Amino acid sequence: MTRCTADNSLTNPAYRRRTMATGEMKEFLGIKGTEPTDFGINSDAQDLPSPSRQASTRRMSIGESIDGKINDWEEPRLDIEGFVVDYFTHRIRQNGMEWFGAPGLPCGVQPEHEMMRVMGTIFEKKHAENFETFCEQLLAVPRISFSLYQDVVRTVGNAQTDQCPMSYGRLIGLISFGGFVAAKMMESVELQGQVRNLFVYTSLFIKTRIRNNWKEHNRSWDDFMTLGKQMKEDYERAEAEKVGRRKQNRRWSMIGAGVTAGAIGIVGVVVCGRMMFSLK
């Protein structure tokens, strides 16, 4: 698929869309304590097709644009089920386990899947406490239903600034949370069988909203990759700065300890000297 290389000026619609999407990504991958924790859906009304997308005289397939091109989120290799399966498997393996009942990936692991792993991991690190709380809500019943799943992800806060009901940040949050819960399920023999249900619920929840909203809001996996790389670089840079500050603080603490020890040594010498003179 070819991609236009339009000038990124403030008057360019594509630039404005990308700026909005970047803001969404930063909002959901931001510093803990400053960002909303909503990666659910505010209301069903948002998922309904808008009047601007009424059926035309010629019936078009879902995802097909006016010029006849197919959006990348309709490509088989980028089915949302593949993202969910890959991330669940990846997250479960992080806990030293295997999801032997995982569906296969007909097209194999894609670069977009690998980027989702990175983004999902970052998201979980920044929302670990919230994940624990929401996971407890979801696992409070013996068997998870789709209705319960929807209720839980809808009550994960409220991000009123989102323009798209399935923004990139919300997408990352849902898959990351699903992987976290799946890993928890695998730790219990009684819950292992429900990982498959969680996979189905997560895939259905996301896929429906992508189909209903991504075309209108000009979202794509291509843009996801571009923004994901930016966020990954920003995160790694911030982490490197933290490590640098910690090392510097340790050096200063060691210098401080050395100065203190030296001062104590000097005081000791002076005191001992005075004692020796007094004995004479």
UniProtKB/Swiss-Prot annotation:
<dbReference type="InterPro" id="IPR002475">
    <property type="entry name" value="Bcl2-like"/>
</dbReference>
<dbReference type="GO" id="GO:0048471">
    <property type="term" value="C:perinuclear region of cytoplasm"/>
</dbReference>
<feature type="short sequence motif" description="BH1">
    <location>
        <begin position="160"/>
        <end position="179"/>
    </location>
</feature>
<feature type="region of interest" description="Disordered">
    <location>
        <begin position="33"/>
        <end position="59"/>
    </location>
</feature>
<feature type="short sequence motif" description="BH4">
    <location>
        <begin position="80"/>
        <end position="99"/>
    </location>
</feature>
<dbReference type="Pfam" id="PF02180">
    <property type="entry name" value="BH4"/>
</dbReference>
<comment type="subunit">
    <text>Interacts with asymmetric homodimer ced-4; the interaction sequesters ced-4. Interacts with egl-1; the interaction results in ced-4 release. Interacts with dre-1; the interaction inhibits ced-9 activity, either directly or indirectly. Interacts with dct-1. May form a complex composed of ced-9, ced-4 and mac-1. Interacts with dynamin-related protein drp-1 (via residues 280-502); the interaction is enhanced by GTP rather than GDP; the interaction is probably direct and may occur at the mitochondrion. Interaction with drp-1 may be enhanced by interaction of ced-9 with egl-1, but not with ced-4.</text>
</comment>
<dbReference type="GO" id="GO:0043065">
    <property type="term" value="P:positive regulation of apoptotic process"/>
</dbReference>
<keyword id="KW-0053">Apoptosis</keyword>
<dbReference type="InterPro" id="IPR046371">
    <property type="entry name" value="Bcl-2_BH1-3"/>
</dbReference>
<protein>
    <recommendedName>
        <fullName>Apoptosis regulator ced-9</fullName>
    </recommendedName>
</protein>
<dbReference type="GO" id="GO:0043204">
    <property type="term" value="C:perikaryon"/>
</dbReference>
<dbReference type="GO" id="GO:0016485">
    <property type="term" value="P:protein processing"/>
</dbReference>
<keyword id="KW-0496">Mitochondrion</keyword>
<dbReference type="GO" id="GO:0098793">
    <property type="term" value="C:presynapse"/>
</dbReference>
<dbReference type="GO" id="GO:0001836">
    <property type="term" value="P:release of cytochrome c from mitochondria"/>
</dbReference>
<dbReference type="GO" id="GO:0005741">
    <property type="term" value="C:mitochondrial outer membrane"/>
</dbReference>
<keyword id="KW-0770">Synapse</keyword>
<dbReference type="InterPro" id="IPR036834">
    <property type="entry name" value="Bcl-2-like_sf"/>
</dbReference>
<dbReference type="GO" id="GO:0140311">
    <property type="term" value="F:protein sequestering activity"/>
</dbReference>
<dbReference type="GO" id="GO:0008630">
    <property type="term" value="P:intrinsic apoptotic signaling pathway in response to DNA damage"/>
</dbReference>
<dbReference type="GO" id="GO:1905808">
    <property type="term" value="P:positive regulation of synapse pruning"/>
</dbReference>
<feature type="short sequence motif" description="BH2">
    <location>
        <begin position="213"/>
        <end position="229"/>
    </location>
</feature>
<dbReference type="GO" id="GO:0015267">
    <property type="term" value="F:channel activity"/>
</dbReference>
<keyword id="KW-0963">Cytoplasm</keyword>
<dbReference type="GO" id="GO:0031333">
    <property type="term" value="P:negative regulation of protein-containing complex assembly"/>
</dbReference>
<dbReference type="InterPro" id="IPR003093">
    <property type="entry name" value="Bcl2_BH4"/>
</dbReference>
<comment type="function">
    <text>Plays a major role in programmed cell death (PCD, apoptosis). egl-1 binds to and directly inhibits the activity of ced-9, releasing the cell death activator ced-4 from a ced-9/ced-4 containing protein complex and allowing ced-4 to activate the cell-killing caspase ced-3. During larval development, required for the elimination of transient presynaptic components downstream of egl-1 and upstream of ced-4 and ced-3 apoptotic pathway. Has been shown in one study to be dispensable in mitochondrial dynamics and morphology during early embryonic development.</text>
</comment>
<keyword id="KW-0472">Membrane</keyword>
<dbReference type="GO" id="GO:0006915">
    <property type="term" value="P:apoptotic process"/>
</dbReference>
<dbReference type="GO" id="GO:0097192">
    <property type="term" value="P:extrinsic apoptotic signaling pathway in absence of ligand"/>
</dbReference>
<comment type="similarity">
    <text>Belongs to the Bcl-2 family.</text>
</comment>
<dbReference type="GO" id="GO:0043025">
    <property type="term" value="C:neuronal cell body"/>
</dbReference>
<dbReference type="GO" id="GO:0000423">
    <property type="term" value="P:mitophagy"/>
</dbReference>
<dbReference type="GO" id="GO:0010636">
    <property type="term" value="P:positive regulation of mitochondrial fusion"/>
</dbReference>
<feature type="compositionally biased region" description="Polar residues">
    <location>
        <begin position="43"/>
        <end position="59"/>
    </location>
</feature>
<dbReference type="GO" id="GO:0031090">
    <property type="term" value="C:organelle membrane"/>
</dbReference>
<dbReference type="GO" id="GO:0005737">
    <property type="term" value="C:cytoplasm"/>
</dbReference>
<dbReference type="GO" id="GO:0043069">
    <property type="term" value="P:negative regulation of programmed cell death"/>
</dbReference>
<dbReference type="GO" id="GO:0050807">
    <property type="term" value="P:regulation of synapse organization"/>
</dbReference>
<dbReference type="GO" id="GO:0043066">
    <property type="term" value="P:negative regulation of apoptotic process"/>
</dbReference>
<dbReference type="GO" id="GO:0005739">
    <property type="term" value="C:mitochondrion"/>
</dbReference>
